[in-house]
A protein has these predicted regions:
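N-terminal Rossmann-like NAD(P) cofactor-binding subdomain of oxidoreductases
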Residues: 1-74, 78, 112, 145, ...
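Charged docking surfaces used in two-component/phosphorelay signaling
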Residues: 62-183
Length: 183
């Protein structure tokens, strides 16, 4: 569940309770950490008919459960492949954008997503470079306006833990940077 993108997916909780025979409690999972860097930004643009996505993710060592002290060989290094990560990063967005049928999540059929996932010498904060093709190509100004106006359920409810501006676009050419922008 990404609350700003697919809050309706909590409907599967009732099916889960029936399947497990429980009246209280449930298991809810968040999406893969790498797709959280780009799926929310693409979600409000789906109305333009996203055809293809090429995403290159630059994943911090925290995603591997490591620190620089426990993984010194990552310093001054890039690991060009993270086992299993590309497959997850190509399938999970379709699940996030999917619909609920008979208490189950049915993945979206499109877009076609291709990823390359790299581990980089950054302590915390994943980054993604994303290239998108659309059926109806929006202008840069249209995209920026959609991102500026986008509000998910947490923002509409003014939840205290929700960021006021869910999607933030940096005007600077050299941003975002994990060290400067992760918090």
């Amino acid at each position: 569940v990404v609350p700003e993108v697919n809050p309706e997916h909590i409907e599967v909780i009732e099916s889960q309770r029936k399947r497990l025979g429980t009246k209280r409690g449930f298991i809810a999972v968040k999406s893969n950490c790498s797709i959280q860097s780009y799926v929310p930004a693409l979600s409000p643009l789906r109305k333009y008919g996203i055809q293809n996505v090429l995403a290159c993710t630059y994943q911090a060592i925290s995603g591997a459960g490591k620190t620089f002290e426990r993984w010194p060989e990552i310093l001054d290094n890039i690991v060009p492949y993270i086992g299993g990560e590309e497959e997850k990063s190509e399938k999970e967005p379709l699940k996030v954008w999917g619909k609920i049928e008979n208490g189950q999540i049915v993945s979206a059929d499109s877009p076609l997503i291709t990823t390359q996932c790299l581990r980089v010498p950054v302590s915390d904060g994943h980054t993604a470079a994303v290239f998108v093709s659309f059926e109806q190509k929006p202008s840069k100004e249209e995209i920026l306006k959609i991102w500026e106006d986008f509000k998910g359920v947490p923002q509409e409810l003014e939840l205290p833990s929700a960021p006021k501006q869910f999607i933030h676009y940096f005007q600077e050419d050299d941003r975002p940077q994990a060290k400067l922008d992760r918090n």
